[in-house]
Amino acid sequence: MKQDTHPDYHFITVVMTDGTTYKTRSTLGKEGDTLNLDIDPKTHPAWTGGGHQLLDRGGRVSRFNAKFGAFTRK
């Protein structure tokens, strides 16, 4: 079997939108890095019934709404 074919799998810290943190294993970054979530199961409209607004990071939501906003149900 080939050596060094798998990426490094190590522990990182995940920070949810409400500040809750937990450790998990990942191939992201390096040992001890932190992943800050913009959206998580506690704030995602699909899991909360759509009551929360999405944060517009980088204008993606605005661009999407500008392009497809006319197709929404009223």
From Swiss-Prot:
<dbReference type="InterPro" id="IPR002150">
    <property type="entry name" value="Ribosomal_bL31"/>
</dbReference>
<comment type="subunit">
    <text>Part of the 50S ribosomal subunit.</text>
</comment>
<comment type="function">
    <text>Binds the 23S rRNA.</text>
</comment>
<protein>
    <recommendedName>
        <fullName>Large ribosomal subunit protein bL31</fullName>
    </recommendedName>
</protein>
<keyword id="KW-0689">Ribosomal protein</keyword>
<dbReference type="GO" id="GO:0006412">
    <property type="term" value="P:translation"/>
</dbReference>
<dbReference type="Pfam" id="PF01197">
    <property type="entry name" value="Ribosomal_L31"/>
</dbReference>
<dbReference type="GO" id="GO:0005840">
    <property type="term" value="C:ribosome"/>
</dbReference>
<dbReference type="GO" id="GO:0003735">
    <property type="term" value="F:structural constituent of ribosome"/>
</dbReference>
<dbReference type="InterPro" id="IPR027491">
    <property type="entry name" value="Ribosomal_bL31_A"/>
</dbReference>
<dbReference type="GO" id="GO:0019843">
    <property type="term" value="F:rRNA binding"/>
</dbReference>
<dbReference type="InterPro" id="IPR034704">
    <property type="entry name" value="Ribosomal_bL28/bL31-like_sf"/>
</dbReference>
<keyword id="KW-0687">Ribonucleoprotein</keyword>
<dbReference type="GO" id="GO:1990904">
    <property type="term" value="C:ribonucleoprotein complex"/>
</dbReference>
<keyword id="KW-0694">RNA-binding</keyword>
<dbReference type="InterPro" id="IPR042105">
    <property type="entry name" value="Ribosomal_bL31_sf"/>
</dbReference>
<comment type="similarity">
    <text>Belongs to the bacterial ribosomal protein bL31 family. Type A subfamily.</text>
</comment>
<keyword id="KW-0699">rRNA-binding</keyword>
